Amino acid sequence: MTVRRPLLAALVLAAVTVAAYLPVLQNGFVHYDDDLYVLDVVQVRDGLTQEGVAWTFTTWQGANWFPLTRLSWMIDAELYGLEPAGFHGTSLLLHVLAALLLHAALLRLTGAALPSLVVAAVFALHPLHVESVAWVAARKDVLSGVAFMAALWAYARQLEAQRPLPWALCVFAVMALGLMAKPMLVTLPCVLLLLDWWPAGRLVDDSGRLVPRRVARAFAEKLPLFALAAAASVVTVAAQRAGGALQALERFPLAVRLETAVEALAIYTLKTFWPVRLAVFHPHPEGGIPGWRTALAVALLLAVSATAFWLRRRAPWWAVGWLWFVGMLVPVLGIVQVGEAAHAERYSYLPQTGLVLALVWGLHHWATGRPARERGAALAAGAALAALALSTAAQVRVWRDDRSLFEHALRVTRDNPVAHINLAVVLAKEGQYGEAERHLDAASVLSPGSAHAWGIRGEVRLASERPAEARDDLVRAVALEPEAVRWRLGLARAHREAGELAAATVQLRAALARDPERADLHALLGLVLADRGETEAALDALAASLRIDPSPGPLHARRAVLL
């Protein structure tokens, strides 16, 4: 193959990927973590500043530590302000770069041009990956994806170099950067060991049998990478624990977690072939997973695993690809439950490549040297890629705004309280309080332990001038999440509108004890104290509010009246 052909293949790959994802440039932000990580974070909104850079390396955010990802958002804010097209364009470019690096890495590792291109094209065009590209908050996926693919390419160079140390250091550095984007790369050393098995052939003898001495030597080479992964795991667990993201066994018992993990693994496998019912959030099934579904999932996984084991010598790509797929998914299968989702499409962003690798090389091996099969395989691959591209373009449009995203989630999932709550927020902003309340009623039934279901319904009822009903909902929200300042602020407003000024004061003082730098808390406390006739205390509270945020004109006027 000439030099020009790989370059031409890369250009075509990039062009087709951009074409499939081009609608993303018309999408806005979604207020589901985009606000948590970007829109409501002053350090990000201000762009690249010395204080912001220091902040990104020294603080948790959303139960995560991903300074490289936050720096990328800061650069976007510096370049584009808060224009969503700029943020989406950066994510798309990173995704294209990851696909090109994967193509280059596989081509260098295997020397097989067409299969390498097909694997990279599936990675670039598969609709399971839309969530990672079209969601600004998922920037950590595409950024860590670039690092992961760059590490594969650098490792391929390490294997062929006469002086491998510089390339080994490059792999270490790229992995470290990737871990600062997302801790998903903790499994990278294991993937590199699999590549030592196939296609590098470093772990086996001429018959394809694994040689323990060679395995031990390859493992020892990667001890620095395993140490880096261990350190990143410690940091990740600390961040998740500090952010309250780790779920207790009482909430999700071990048996439930294992059932969920098995079903999630089967779902990721099946959706690789038939990517339907894609949604931003997949809830745990109400009442648990039926036994027959768990049995089918176990049967599927055992069948694939047995086949890969049986073919491990004469067709090692099956075992390598399957272990890559399963191994990279293990940290996100829910055995250590983080968050509320049963599974998420974005978790398959890097693992799926292992499964696709096995399938494509299996098809390549079956067709090679048989012209009729080669033509059939080429037609099948072309048709599959075209279908994936069209499906991806359609899925990108689902992410155009909050309403589209959560209406779609409710159409393709069942009993989804998160989708009900977030769609209710959209409707409430549009003044459709009755429709919003209907969704919040459903959410409170599906998830009676959700503070958001009760608290947001209380806020909606408060906005529709029903303070007594709002108060009852917000009391439940505070009981479920007593550390949340938002619910105490809402409850204080409900108490004030109901004329319960003493109760409002209690809630505001409790909220200020948790967050003394919230201007709106001081402001409302000042107004409540003024209503109670406590002029001096009211003036102090209003002054504190204006010290933190001097902009609100009505507060200046009210303070002047009290003076």
Predicted feature locations:
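C-terminal luminal/periplasmic domains and tails of membrane-associated envelope-modifying transferases
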Residues: 1, 403-563
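Polytopic membrane enzymes that build or remodel cell-surface glycoconjugates and lipids
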Residues: 1-459, 463, 479, 486
